[in-house]
Amino acid sequence: MSRAMVAIVGRPNVGKSTLFNRILKRRISIVEDIPGVTRDRIYGNAEWLNRKFILVDTGGLDPDPKDVIFSKVKLQVEAAIEAADLILFVVDAREGLVPEDEEIANMLRKTKKEVILVCNKVDSFKEMPASFYDFFKLGLGEPIPISASNGLGIGELLDEVIKRLPENDVEYEEETIKIAVIGRPNVGKSSLVNRILGEERVIVSDIPGTTRDAIDTPFTKDGRNYILIDTAGIRRKSRISESIERYSVLRALAAIERADICLLMIDATEGPTEQDTKIAGYAFENGKGIIILVNKWDIVEKDSNTYKEYTEMIREKLAFISFAPILFISAKTGQRIHKVLETVDKVWEEYNKRITTGLLNNVLNEAMLMFPPPSSKGRPIKIYYATQVGTKPPTFVIFVNEPELLHFSYVRFLENTIRQNFGFEGVPIVISTKKRGED
């Protein structure tokens, strides 16, 4: 089940990032010790009253304080409107109503999105500042007063957020593979989608979806059901310039959240970019299957070493997803497109694979005999056993005497051992450690 997306918008310096951090507290997931995974977080997983949602901070999209002009604010709002289910429009009670607030409100009123007007920097509810009442003029309902810096009113705001969130999406059948095509603008996502749907034996369903599902295309091939989450379809509805790459992560995030397997498209003429790394990092952190598609391979000048050199470059720049298979394709000519769904099927099998506890421990015990876990601070580390506790992605728990002493590098060694013996190509592996006797 996918989570709704809530975007915080507003002009600069009204407290968007402060509100973002206040709601998330320590919930932001940052992967440590993995080179290439960005840490400049613009989104986080939030929860209130047992309802989970994604929170997006548009304030983090343009960190350049020298370029605070309304055109940038407008792009932030448009990006949020495009991807979000609910908008938190933040205004500043101390500064009062300003023309930029009215411009943003005009844009929001023209949309069909739910909007909550949030009046920040209200330090006391006993006596509202006179400026508070001016915000009623925006025509977006009664403002909710808060102080993001001290937490005043945050609970009431989140109560309202939960009331306004859309009902959960319709769930597809368990065996339906949800595929997201992700990547930077103009990398060929639309062409790939059209190629896949135009393949022989692909039957596209004509079942209409909900508003949010309108960009989903159900189809079958050889008796297997798929859902193609078409981020290119979102783009066609957008007024956002495709040259504004920093905003494309919102589109990718919405698709990644709902997918099982992500097709990360890279432009062969440019190679992996920082933006590719960021999008890949989102997919990795969300535990999705990943296949790297190097598109426009037909126009790359090649010699006998080109394939090898290009593969090595991708592995170096996207080292944290070294498990992902790489396909060199051309969406324009159809080169190797037939391999895409074949690889999706293989990754799906790996995504759902289970290893018996007995077999898993036989392999790990043999590896630990050859390379025992090093002691830490003079204290020996004992690994008792491991077991697989979940799939999609494959998730393992290792029971030890002192979990905090087991270095991440040894956990990485155990992960590599699992991969060498059991495969899991195309999927991340999640490993946690627990003290024996813990639930």
UniProtKB/Swiss-Prot annotation:
InterPro entries: AAA+_ATPase, G_ENGA, GTP-bd, GTPase_Der, KH_dom-like, KH_dom-like_a/b, P-loop_NTPase, Small_GTP-bd. SMART domains: AAA. GTP 2 binds at residues 183-190, 230-234, 295-298. GO terms for biological process: ribosome biogenesis. Residues 353-437 form the KH-like domain. GTP 1 binds at residues 10-17, 57-61, 120-123. NCBIfam families: GTPase_EngA, small_GTP. Belongs to the TRAFAC class TrmE-Era-EngA-EngB-Septin-like GTPase superfamily. EngA (Der) GTPase family. This is GTPase Der.
